[in-house]
Amino acid sequence: MRAAVLRSYGDPLAVEEVSDPEPDPDGAVVRVDACGVCRSDWHAWKGHGEWADNRVPTGQVLGHEPAGEVIAVGDRVDRFAVGDPVVVPFSLGDGTCSYCRRGHGNVCADGRALGFGPDAPGAFAERVAVPTADYNLVSRPDWLSARDAAALGCRYMTAYHALAERAGLDGGDWLAVHGCGGVGLSAVQLGSALGATVVAVDVDDGALSRAAAIGADHTVDPGALAGTDDTVPDRLRELRDGGVDVSMDALGIAETCRNSVRSVRPRGTHVQVGLTTDAERGEVSLPTDWMTRWEVSFVGSRGMPPTNYDDLFSLIEASDVDPGALVSRELALSEVSERLAAMGEYDVRGVEVVTEFDR
């Protein structure tokens, strides 16, 4: 089968023939009909993560936002059969550890990350193997196309887990989203659907326009504050006296992280979703005394447990959230490298999805 393989950090992925995957006795193989291209793929492509012992090795097939159809199952799989439409989460649990048993498979003690390690080849490929299929595979509703499910990918589910499950966002809350790429725009849509007043923060006019079109009640451009005495936290406190209830850093650079923390009200919550770059190397200094004084919570959030997808699907079906509305471009497998490079220049708008795997 054709797959896009990381051979050298920062160089074009090698689109080459690799062996077809075979299902484990408790696993499945999925034909990939669509796979999103995510900033986490960019981090992997650049070789980031060395500082956290989390660097993706060369030789890896990247891609972690697939949707498609089951084409083979092992003899110990009970819940899925050939022909079933599915979504494949990138956080793959073993289904048996204490975290998985409590519904936290995204932090499984023996978990795998699809597309980020040799034990889980990714989905920039025609087919992908899924271990422990009964636990990890997610049935895809009839109303959700593979393309739109790939847009859901790790963006909507990451945003949903961060807002609804980690930060406890409620109807009537104020939410600030710092960084309006794929995850950030998903958070804007979902925050609005959950009943929050949403403020989108980004330096790009196009990103802010898109955020306003899909649910942001207010927008803030940090660049427009240059040369003034105002800061992003100041502006957010003007909009919502005392600060917002929940603030998300969806980008990961030091400035957005600190701005997000400083934007919340007393006893508010900052949720960290964006991963750092070479500049931060996993470390950002924070106003810890101020956070202690005002009992500000800082929570990390990674992906979403595979067992929680039905809650997200129910919210999408019951609201006007449209994952497909964020798809800005459909790609061929051979175009992935070019689009990863564009991410380094912050020249990607919305969500880009691979839908052609034969070129």
Task: Give the label of every model feature segment.
Residues P21-C35, E50-R101, P121, P141-W143:
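Glycine-rich beta-strand-centered segment in the early N-terminal region that forms part
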Residues M1-E65, E126-V128, D358-R359:
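Short N-terminal strand-loop motif that marks the start
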Residues D94-H178:
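NAD(P)H dinucleotide-binding glycine-rich loop of Rossmann-like/cofactor-binding domains
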Residues P85, D142-L225:
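Mid-domain Rossmann-like dinucleotide-binding core that forms the NAD(H)/NADP(H) cofactor-binding site
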Residues L175, V271, V321-V327, E338-R359:
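C-terminal capping/lid region of NAD(P)-dependent oxidoreductase domains
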